[in-house]
Amino acid sequence: MKGDKREEQGPGPETVAPQQPTEDEEALIEFHRSYRELFQFFCNNTTIHGAIRLVCSKHNRMKTAFWAVLWLCTFGMMYWQFGLLFGEYFSYPVNLNINLNSDKLVFPAVTVCTLNPYRYPEITEQLKELDSITQQTLLDLFKYNASTLEAQPRHRRDVHPPLPHPLQRLRVPPPRLEARRARSSASSVRDNSPEVGRKDWMIGFQLCNQNRSDCFYQRYSSGVDAVREWYRFHYINILSRLSDTSLSREQLGNFIFTCRFNQAFCGDGNYSHFHHPMYGNCYTFNDKNNSSLWMSSMPGINNGLSLTLRTEQNDFIPLLSTVTGARVMVHGQDEPAFMDDGGFNLRPGVETSISMRKESLDRLGGDYGDCTQNGSDVPVKNLYRSKYTQQVCIHSCFQENMVKECGCAYIFYPLPEGVEYCDYRKHNSWGYCYYKLQDAFSSDRLGCFTKCRKPCSVTNYELSAGYSRWPSVTSQDWVFQMLSLQNNYTVSNKRNGVAKLNIYFKELNYKANSESPSVTMVTLLSNLGSQWSLWFGSSVLSVVEMAELLFDLSVITFLMLLRRFRSRYWSPGRGAGGAREVASSPVSALPSRFCPHPTSPSVPQPGPTLPPSLTAPPPAYATLGPCLSQSGSACAPGEP
């Protein structure tokens, strides 16, 4: 019956099992099943030279080993070169580019000082007292009797009270006692009074701290240096009591006889004035306060600044200034004039012609150099209120430490807000503090030279000077006569009373130096590509292939670790067989290939494999296992 029924149905459509998805439909991303398969595929298809030899020579193990070693050595050499290239790039080298430009140039600022510290009427009596005590000291120490002494020396000492820190003769200790003398430097200087004729003594003065618990001697081997420094120390104390309102222009005297720029007269509106404690009255021509900056369109001595200066010192301070003439400095319009650091002296009776050449330098900051653009990132406050320069920062740093350590400001540098200049009437130990601080500053223990970085943009002027006698012997009479009539001033000592100064551009060509990165990112990539092509003869796509290989290796390693983890922790009750089953299931689930590649025709291709959930046997729980009856036969389910 059933057979007839089947015959009636005839050859109908056969029952077909659900078709398994093909390999191309299984997943969007597929990976190789082993390291060997991945490496073989890479060597067969990569564009890197030499990799195919690792597969083609697999039947000759010697060749395989040779090419493997050669490939690894080449790979190592290439990455060694890569390390050198990256090391050079991250050392941030720079190239110095030199350009020669020619154009109209802005004439720099020129500062000229009298070299004659001024005697202000407000402190005349105090300066006379200092001069008198100094003359008495010279008589006591060097038997020098100056003609300015109007009375006997002993009476002079009785009239004027002694100044603090008197100048003394100091005995030079033997070398073996120098360390002991340094430890006991607070001993009285009255014991150090050897005869003048002996050579084992020096000149100096004693300086102590506030409570006189520590003292030292400021000593000099030259008597001239000792007298000048001692006089200078007391002079700036007196000068600190002078108010700024006393520095009026009406008291400056006649210093500049004539002034011309580009053959045109320059007047009061072309210069500004300031006072220097040591160099006297100073005039700055063509500074930032000038109405319009001077321009030089032609080189030569007739197209620059020409000054005729008075160098007589009728009311000079001989114990403070031992030279005569004038001091000049060339600098930028927005830079202060540091006469001690960059100036030089002019001789009386001489025409000094100074030719200039401009030179600029632009440094690279950041990783390429330790420079600052405007000083805003420097931990030192600019006291000069001008453009940042390294000298501005260094002097501001010293003044900052002076105020912090000594409680007062040094008169040579700008006065900070809320601080007064040092005066031993108010700060009796400031000299001790200053000389200690000066020693620490010179040895960079204050850190000023480290804090103050170089500016990224600098403009310098290269100077060269020429000298000639002026005026000549045949022309000096009428020249001095004209100067006397024109300026209503009589030149008493003709040749030592005047000096002439010419400052001009030697040529309008100026050198512009600039730094540029020696190795840029483009250069680095080019060098890396050159090395890659040299050792492997490949391109950027080959680098992508290497990255893909590393990615596949990491994924396969992750899958292997995942299988091991699942076999150990996810199937605890299935025994060794279950562990082997679970461990082998991901392999069967993986695709057989990553992309088509030739295989042997004799090897049968594996068919679609059912997932482990369909082929695995049911779990063997202990309660469902076979039980034996007393007769030894198996019992049916539910049977006791």
Curated annotation (Swiss-Prot):
UniProt keywords, alphabetically: Cell membrane, Cell projection, Cilium, Cytoplasm, Cytoplasmic vesicle, Disulfide bond, Flagellum, Glycoprotein, Ion channel, Ion transport, Membrane, Sodium, Sodium channel, Sodium transport, Transmembrane, Transmembrane helix, Transport, Ubl conjugation
Region (Disordered): 1-23, 595-617
Family: Belongs to the amiloride-sensitive sodium channel (TC 1.A.6) family. SCNN1A subfamily.
Positions of the UniProt region annotated as Gating release of inhibition by proteolysis (GRIP): 154-222
Biased composition range(s): Pro residues: 598-617
Topology, Cytoplasmic side: 1-65, 561-640
GO CC list: acrosomal vesicle; apical plasma membrane; ciliary membrane; cytoplasm; motile cilium; plasma membrane; sodium channel complex; sperm principal piece
Self-association and partners: Heterotrimer; containing an alpha/SCNN1A, a beta/SCNN1B and a gamma/SCNN1G subunit. Interacts with WWP1 (via WW domains). Interacts with WWP2 (via WW domains); inhibits the channel. Interacts with BPIFA1; the interaction is indirect via SCNN1B and inhibits the proteolytic processing of SCNN1A and SCNN1G and the activation of ENaC. Interacts with the full-length immature form of PCSK9 (pro-PCSK9).
Name listed for the protein in its UniProt record: Epithelial sodium channel subunit alpha
Substrates-to-products reaction catalysed: Na(+)(in) = Na(+)(out)
Pfam families, alphabetized: ASC
InterPro entries attached to this UniProt entry: ENaC, ENaC_chordates, ENaC_CS
Keyword Endoplasmic reticulum among record annotations: no
Residue intervals annotated with topology Extracellular: 87-539
Post-translational modification: Ubiquitinated. Can be ubiquitinated at multiple sites and undergo monoubiquitination and polyubiquitination. Ubiquitination by NEDD4 or NEDD4L inhibits the ENaC channel through endocytosis, intracellular retention and degradation of its individual subunits.
Inhibition and activation profile: Originally identified and characterized by its inhibition by the diuretic drug amiloride.
Function: This is one of the three pore-forming subunits of the heterotrimeric epithelial sodium channel (ENaC), a critical regulator of sodium balance and fluid homeostasis. ENaC operates in epithelial tissues, where it mediates the electrodiffusion of sodium ions from extracellular fluid through the apical membrane of cells, with water following osmotically. It plays a key role in maintaining sodium homeostasis through electrogenic sodium reabsorption in the kidneys. Additionally, ENaC is essential for airway surface liquid homeostasis, which is crucial for proper mucus clearance.
Transmembrane segments: 66-86, 540-560
GO MF annotation list: ligand-gated sodium channel activity
Topological type in the membrane: Multi-pass membrane protein
Motif (PY motif): 617-621
Cysteine disulfide partners in this protein: 113-282, 208-215, 259-266, 371-456, 393-433, 393-452, 397-448, 406-433, 406-456, 408-422
